Structure formats: C-alpha cells, structure tokens
Amino acid sequence: MNNLVKIVLNVIPRNLLTRLSFLLKPLIKIYLFGKKHVDPIDNSSFRKFLPYGYNKIRVNALSPSTFSLERHRLLWLYLKRETDFFSKKIKVLHFAPEAAFLEKFKKLKNISYSTIDLNSPLADIKADICNLPICSDSYDFILCNHVLEHIVDDEKAMKELYRVLKKGGTGIFQVPLNMSNKQTYEDFTITDPKERNKAFGQYDHVRVYGMDFFERLEKVGFKVEKCEYTLKLSDDEKIKYCLPKKEIIPVCVK
C-alpha cells in the first residue's frame, strides 16, 4: 500500500490526481467508514484515514471526505477557534486552493473569496505569484500554504503577497519546515525531479526551509507570529483529528 501511494503521488500529474480523487471519493468514504477519527472540516468520521507521503509515508494522514492533510485540519481548527475568519466581513485571496477548504470557503457569506494559481484547475485567477495582476492593498486575508517552497524567487513572491495585502491584514503562509535547521537549504543547480526529490523531499520543491523562513517574511515587511497551535490542543484531540505532532502556523500581519 505504501509503495502504491508513493508511485501515485510521484507519477500522476497533480491536476489529474485532483480530478481522479473526486471521482473515487464516494467509494473510499464507504470503505473507510467508522468512528475512531474525525475530520473537523466536515465532521465526517472514519475507522482510519488514508496514508500519504511522497517519500516517507504517514499513516492516518489524508481524510477520505475532504482530502485534508494533518496541517489542513490543524489550520481549520485554528481559524475556527482563534480568529474571526468565519464571522467578519473580509476579502480573501487563496493561493493554490486546497480541495479540503474550497467548497467550505465558497459557501461562507461573510467573505468575498477569490482563488488564484498558475496551474490549478480549482483556481478562479490564473497568475504567477511573482507578478500578480492585482492592485496593491486589495485583500484583508491571504492564504498561501505550501506554495513558496516551489518558487525560485521566493523573496519576490513574498513582496507581492505583502503588496496586495491591506494594511492591518493577515496572511498565513505555511511551508514544509525543518525546525532542526537554522538556515534554509537551497541549490538552484538541482533541476532534475529525482534529484530534487532527494534533496528537498519532493520532485517540484526548490528548497527546504529552515527557521530563517520567518526572517525572510520579516525582511519584506511582515510582522510574524510563530503559532504552534498543537500545544493548545489535548492529546485526545490530536488523535481524534489526526493532527501533526509539530507544526508552526506563520501568522503574518502587514
């Protein structure tokens, strides 16, 4: 099973995988139905979640109902419990919109919601994050998760995120983070997908961020809070929702 997961993730193009997953969802939900684990995004329960991982396979990672991963479920709980995202009138820009959130966010009456990506079939706007066709100070809230590790000129991308966010606005920019490393590891001479997979953990990544990631965000102007939200949750909740053991949510304010 684990080898099959690796093959599927590394061989099938992401756009095609997104479409296939929606077709297979009803069958998967029936097969895994149970009460042990709950997806907080839609409150569906299952006897187990699906395994996931490009290299190291994680058990109970992918929800069969929303296709949320551990980090998505943690972010959902954070937004629900710690912010006014679901109640305040705000204008939201969502980069590389995750299927786990898309339909839920579209139905929220309090937000004006736009999605953006260069390639995603789920996006409303097709655009390069380094050259956004958007006026400055346009959005109250920006979600841009697991995007920056794909961008060669991440400083330019961060500057664009800062530019289109309103003063006082909030951005959440999660990335794969190696908390053991102070410095980010990047080598732009590595272009072969297999070599990138070895070096950066995924075939289309161009770096592994270290703890200096937050300094990069601060350099372009953001005030950054490193929110370790799992520390606020009980062990029972972490098991119930299949949450990451360690995850920092970068909450960035302009």
Feature map (PLM): residue ranges:
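An acidic- and aromatic-residue-enriched active-site/binding cleft used to recognize and process polar
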Residues: L118, C144, P176-N178
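Short catalytic micro-motifs in class I SAM-dependent methyltransferases
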Residues: H146-H150
